[in-house]
């Protein structure tokens, strides 16, 4: 029998110290990685529940194990809430991650060796959109499209040309580092022209879509996937959505289980259900508007200080800072800002002369920043502090002094806007 007083701190103090250190880091550092967010105590409560003990292979009402009557309720709630949130007819809440959701879509709609057309990782796509280092680039004949380097905007004429030339089985729309608005209808038009499936990965903008602040791809795509963290702010996991299509729905269900996964993580599915309920609340839309406002405010500060923003601005939660003109690598910028307790990630920019391990840019996102209550004015000031660090990066002595000064400002901002009050 387990005693409910059992805890990690007493049993494994070494591990507990790493956990408490990370909790403190999250409170003391400003998080600007576009794919990261803070999840609610309610979501964490579900994830830490006894639902983790239950195996539930199959789907609600059709399981391969007994004793699933209560986890069926949790999964059914998650399914219905996801469908309602995004106006979908079908939802599969079982994928353990966005990448596994994407893998299931490939398995459902393509055969190994089929041609796919997706956004190049170097231009803002994702590993699973056909990168040669991913299963999507190894199992399938991946053709890649990108942005117009001069404008930073998707080149729809080039996408259409590639589609006509290569006749892909599936076209993938979506991104991990693109600050514009995607024209889902145009992608649908191109897919229809060549008889391809249209698969949209909206992992980065799902929260904005749920709040009505970014175009919803569900009415246009054959299949849509997303992660459930990032802008949605839920637990780490994946989600598949679709319009009513019995044949595709059956293929998707079979591709997730037994195709890609065995037993679903019922504690995480319960956490997804909680998160979807939170996303339907009016305050979630207010939060997403703050995400947008903060990103736009930061862009203005960077532009005012002479830094180039890929595409010239942002229409979502993220933007790319191009550091080529300053001869600063993304790697050294990432490290310097990290020393000032500002967490970002290095990122390639269009026509980047440096390797993906070094890069010439930074990807900056505001979901976590807005989550802790930071407003647009504070975000604009934060961006100026970041510019101070970047401006000093070539002068070791000046950089050390600047980092010390910025850390003091960051500490005050974090204290004024705690993650978990």
Swiss-Prot record:
Superkingdom field: Bacteria
Gene Ontology terms for molecular function: glycine hydroxymethyltransferase activity; pyridoxal phosphate binding
Matches recorded under Pfam families: SHMT
UniProt site (Plays an important role in substrate specificity): 229
Cofactor(s), by name: pyridoxal 5'-phosphate
Listed InterPro entries: PyrdxlP-dep_Trfase, PyrdxlP-dep_Trfase_major, PyrdxlP-dep_Trfase_small, Ser_HO-MeTrfase, Ser_HO-MeTrfase-like, Ser_HO-MeTrfase_PLP_BS, SHMT-like_dom
Pathway(s) the chain acts in: One-carbon metabolism; tetrahydrofolate interconversion; Amino-acid biosynthesis; glycine biosynthesis; glycine from L-serine: step 1/1
Reactions catalysed, as given in the entry: (6R)-5,10-methylene-5,6,7,8-tetrahydrofolate + glycine + H2O = (6S)-5,6,7,8-tetrahydrofolate + L-serine
Modified residues (N6-(pyridoxal phosphate)lysine): 230
Compartments, record wording: Cytoplasm
Entry binding sites for (6S)-5,6,7,8-tetrahydrofolate: 121, 125-127, 355-357
Any one GO biological process: glycine biosynthetic process from serine
Entry keyword set: Amino-acid biosynthesis, Cytoplasm, One-carbon metabolism, Pyridoxal phosphate, Transferase
GO cellular component: cytosol
Gene3D superfamilies to which the protein is assigned, alphabetical: Aspartate Aminotransferase, domain 1, Type I PLP-dependent aspartate aminotransferase-like (Major domain)
Main location: cytoplasm
Enzyme Commission number, as recorded: 2.1.2.1
Family: Belongs to the SHMT family.
Protein name: Serine hydroxymethyltransferase
Annotated organism of origin: Psychromonas ingrahamii (strain DSM 17664 / CCUG 51855 / 37)
